[in-house]
Amino acid sequence: MSSRSPRPPPRRSRRRLPRPSCCCCCCRRSHLNEDTGRFVLLAALIGLYLVAGATVFSALESPGEAEARARWGATLRNFSAAHGVAEPELRAFLRHYEAALAAGVRADALRPRWDFPGAFYFVGTVVSTIGFGMTTPATVGGKAFLIAYGLFGCAGTILFFNLFLERIISLLAFIMRACRERQLRRSGLLPATFRRGSALSEADSLAGWKPSVYHVLLILGLFAVLLSCCASAMYTSVEGWDYVDSLYFCFVTFSTIGFGDLVSSQHAAYRNQGLYRLGNFLFILLGVCCIYSLFNVISILIKQVLNWMLRKLSCRCCARCCPAPGAPLARRNAITPGSRLRRRLAALGADPAARDSDAEGRRLSGELISMRDLTASNKVSLALLQKQLSETANGYPRSVCVNTRQNGFSGGVGALGIMNNRLAETSASR
């Protein structure tokens, strides 16, 4: 009987396990730096947007400016030669005219700048931040008063714009919800006896329904276009501008850019002057409020694009730091069956029972740690839920979301804070 030499135990190849904290640290850093990353990314995109805009406008307007300079130089030389006036004296006279022009003096008869209607038009352009520039204070007292007056006036007007945005979003949500209820009632998905606030409405899907930001954007855009077209028709007939110039004036005014190259209601007299000034005031007020609301809705779309770009960058970062989806992970505190470990120990000739106690101890420790974390998170969730139910019972429903950074829209100040949780894209459930 030949004695075989005992086979050496198979060599255990130690797998290089990935560092479990790398991905967590990466995700934690991206979570903490989400606002900073969004700010830096938006600043970079705005910089590129400015460069692109400057390139386009320079290509469009620079040739016309060069031609205008050449024509003006030729006109100046011809006038100097024809009338026997030295060119330096003529330029000095033109500088005096420019100073008078800045003070409000025009060759044609214009309305007084600082009577009560003119001053009211001026303060309207100040507090709305339009600032046409056709009228400016020239005295020291007027400039000092403008600083204090504009500080509180602009702040109050911005608050008015935000409240208008809140009202218009609530109105659109109410109308679109009513249309959706009517559509569901026609299709038979909603009972005819359905009423808001009933027990059925709480179980129905309409209880958490919110309008989409794209629908609100479409409605506000159509209203802004309609308002601009009507105002442009009025300015074309009264001011004598081209229709394109009138549309250009409407956008410059409604968006509070206020270049001042075209300014309405500046002639000394108009036909139906009182009616025209009232219409001009109402069109500018509604236009500024509408375009302000439209800008804030567009900013939600821009923020969605920024969040999408940040998610893509975060996924690429985590893909470099974390293992592939199919790679085995060693979880220290995971609750896993011990059959695979016993089979490996039996194949190696070791006694599985010798290591069961140690493995069982580690597994129980992991269970205790996991249960402790779960209990703590449940306490936080229960406290938030109790707060939400209490506020709802008192008539002040506030949506509370545990994952406050799921969509990047929770919280916020100003217009973003007003639209938070009022649209489908800014809802805390997304």
Curated annotation (Swiss-Prot):
Glycosylated residues (UniProt): N78
Chain ranges inside the bilayer that never cross it: 114-134, 243-263
GO biological process: potassium ion transmembrane transport
Main location: membrane
An example Gene Ontology molecular-function term: potassium ion leak channel activity
Cell compartment(s), UniProt: Cell membrane; Endoplasmic reticulum membrane
Outcome following mutation: R12A: Disrupts ER retention/retrieval signal resulting in localization at the plasma membrane and K(+) channel conductance. Results in 174 -fold increase in current amplitude
One CC-aspect GO term: endoplasmic reticulum membrane
Subunit-level organization: Homodimer. Heterodimer with KCNK13.
Name used for this protein in its record: Potassium channel subfamily K member 12
UniProt source species: Homo sapiens (Human)
Gene: KCNK12
